[in-house]
Amino acid sequence: EDFVNLYKATIDKFNDKFALFEEVTGDKIGYWYHNSHYKTRSGTLGSSCMSNVDEEFFDIYISNPDVCSLVIYKSEEDPEKIMGRALLWKLRDGKKYMDRIYTVNDSDVQLFRDYAKENGWYVKRYNSSSASNEAFSPDGSVVSLDMVVNIKSGGYEKYPYLDTLKYWNRSEGTLSTSGCSDCYTLEDTDGEYHRCESCGGRGEVECYDCDGRGTTECHRCDGEGEKNCSNCDGEGTIMHEDS
């Protein structure tokens, strides 16, 4: 299947499908996010949890046009509809990063990646909702990025569900892939933000097996580091019986 998708994307590229891509900012992000502008409501694009919400959910995107845009892939049959979309972030170190890709057709994910490569952008390695900092670089190698975006610190009406840069530090005005004690998690489909009840926003919790010590007591030796021999009861010798 991966080979077929790669083959289809290669053919599409030579057929000048790149001309159907467009980068939009501001209010246009909310416009193209809505499923009324999808060619069909299928694939990962049609099943996205943010495909049928009010535009105010996207305030954090719309209000930060210098660092956030949306790459859309228009339908060849109907340019007023799209076949895919992906957020494009400008990280604090200046790199451009393409986030999770949502498409009607699986093969178009590779087309998005090819388009990103053509523009010198980095692309999320695993096309999922994981808060990972691994990405494909423009030369195709896998790299770990400094995944931090500087945004306006507040004043948003609602908040979107974020796939990757889901930790919002309100005081510092950043989105990142790493939790912190001052961070809120943007993983709510109702437009709210939350501080994780389990980790307090740190992104990690104490191990329940070792209570944070890093070691656990051996159930065979009761933590002594040794146990009595079952053959000699720890005496070191056994009774010899003549046959």
Tell where the protein language model's regions lie, with residue ranges.
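Short loop/turn and capping residues at structural boundaries
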Residues: 126-129, 210, 232
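Surface-exposed beta-strand edges and their flanking turn/coil or helix-capping segments
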Residues: 111-113, 232-233, 242
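Cys/His/Pro-rich metal-binding microdomains
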Residues: 181, 197, 208, 219, ...
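Non-catalytic substrate-recognition and accessory regions of acyl/acetyltransferase enzymes
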Residues: 1-99, 103-193, 200
